[in-house]
Design a protein with these regions (language model features):
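A short hydrophobic beta-strand segment most commonly corresponding to one strand
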Residues: 92-94, 145-160
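Glycine- and acidic-residue-biased ligand/ion/polar-headgroup-sensing regions
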Residues: 87-103
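Ligand-binding loop in jelly-roll beta-barrel domains
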Residues: 131-151
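Short acidic-glycine-tyrosine-enriched beta hairpin
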Residues: 107-136, 179
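Conserved short histidine dyad/triad with adjacent acidic residue
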Residues: 72-86, 132-134
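N-terminal leader/capping segments at the start of a protein or of a new domain
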Residues: 1-42
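A short glycine-rich, His/Asp/Glu-containing loop-to-beta-strand
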Residues: 50-78, 126
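Long hydrophobic alpha-helical segments typical of transmembrane helices together
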Residues: 169-191
Length: 191
């Protein structure tokens, strides 16, 4: 089952992006839309909330047919985290359940990456990434004993974008395409 909030978010995000706003406007206006969505924890279908015992899950919720944006439910099992990685596009992270620690990395003159301070996202809060300002980070579930869920929105189909993980000590990149763990997406029009 889907919930009207998900459909409303997709419609509003689509309307905004069709106007071709500048990235700072996308991040500001998109963050407001996403904050409204994650303010309520009653719309995400249960099948997109299931953790995996070994690694985080990336469930596709929506992918715009023109690649204007995609929307993903990230489900973090206890203690799970990403490697240091980039996105190659803008992104918004809305915390739905639990807590997540977002740690940005800063490229140094020698090519290595220096770890910055982590920011903890609480339910209802929204963070962002952008190649223009802060694209390289590591994300971790704050909790060691329970799952957390965040809703991510990206400027393109993130599951098809060629991105990179980095060795922070050397800066050495390794290319990857994340894909998705689900084979079906929510029916936005079925209430």
């Amino acid at each position: 089952m889907s919930h009207p909030s998900l459909l409303n978010f997709v419609q509003e995000m689509s309307r905004m992006l069709q106007g071709k706003p500048a990235e700072p406007d996308i991040l500001m206006r998109g963050a407001s839309l996403l904050a409204n969505l994650v303010a309520n924890d009653n719309w995400l279908p249960e099948e997109f909330t299931r953790p995996h015992p070994q690694h985080y899950q990336q469930y596709l919720l929506y992918a715009d047919p023109l690649d204007l944006f995609s929307m993903v439910s990230f489900v973090w099992g206890p203690g799970q985290k990403t490697p240091v990685h980039d996105h190659m596009t803008w992104g918004l992270i809305g915390m739905l359940r639990g807590k997540e620690v977002d740690t940005h990395y800063h490229k140094q003159k020698d090519g290595s990456y220096r770890r910055g301070e982590g920011v903890t996202l609480l339910p209802g809060q929204v963070g962002s990434v952008s190649p223009a300002t802060h694209d390289v980070h590591e994300v971790a579930n704050f909790y060691q004993d329970r799952s957390s869920i965040s809703i991510h929105v990206y400027g393109g189909n993130i599951g098809r974008i060629n991105r990179h993980v980095f060795d922070p000590a050397t800066g050495q990149p390794t290319s990857f395409v994340s894909g998705y763990c689900n084979s079906v997406v929510p029916n936005l029009w079925k209430m």
